Amino acid sequence: MAVDLESLLQRYVMFLLHQKGLSGETYRAYHNDMNHLMSFLRERGGEEISKETVRSYMLKLHTTYSRATINRKLSAIKGFFDFIIRQGALEANPFSHVRSLKNPGSLPRFLTPDEVFDLIDATKNSRDRAILELLYSTGIRVGEVEAMNCYDVDMTAGFVLVTGKGKKQRRVPVGRRAQAAIRMYLRERGIDDPIYSRDPLFLNSRGKRITTRSIRWIVSKWSTQAALSRQVSPHVIRHSFATHMLDSGADLRSIQEMLGHASLSTTQRYTHLTVDKLMDVYDKAHPRAKEE
């Protein structure tokens, strides 16, 4: 298979970014996945991909990564070789016979409401508090926070405009506490009404748009400061938002819309958490639930 994979990879990542409209976070993940494969091929002395090469690479993945990460990498690789076929440089996808791994059905980790409150109360500056309040108030993704501009926040209507995967936009309600935290932070920057500002919503210490890496670091830093018993990430806060909403009676369709899930089945993971809670309450409270 004498094809210039490196050159085709550059064309593929540009295709993902400009034509497929992948979010920055997903684009970077796919790009890193393909670079991982390229590095593996270079270590083997070239870019020729045989069945043995595919088997060796998949074995390497199985000994290093989780099922979810392996499936994501496999999806990126299959998409890349399908792209090469469409370009006329290959006749068959060398990874087409490799099946995705079944998800064991692990439930998302989440914080209790008290843990979330402790996390937010531990913050010592207005920007970080506004970020944490926004994450928990809306359940949006870390990459969506990074991409937000000031004019995406409508204080009057109580909504934020979120640009999600595939450049799809949705309006998500934002609570009063999050609004107040954002307003305080923006006023420190001299912005009274965000709807009239085209600046990034959150800035780093150099006055540039904050990155997803920085947001993750902020969440981790304050979770340590709050002495929480588990490591916290923006995604854990997102799971906490969904779980708390469902526990409080919100319907699945509304949660799906707020989270930006394309499929309701993705949102339905949270129903398992609520069922577990209901069973626990039932076992403790119902007179006929206890064993004699």
What residue ranges belong to the model's regions?
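Conserved catalytic core of the tyrosine transesterase superfamily
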Residues: 1-292
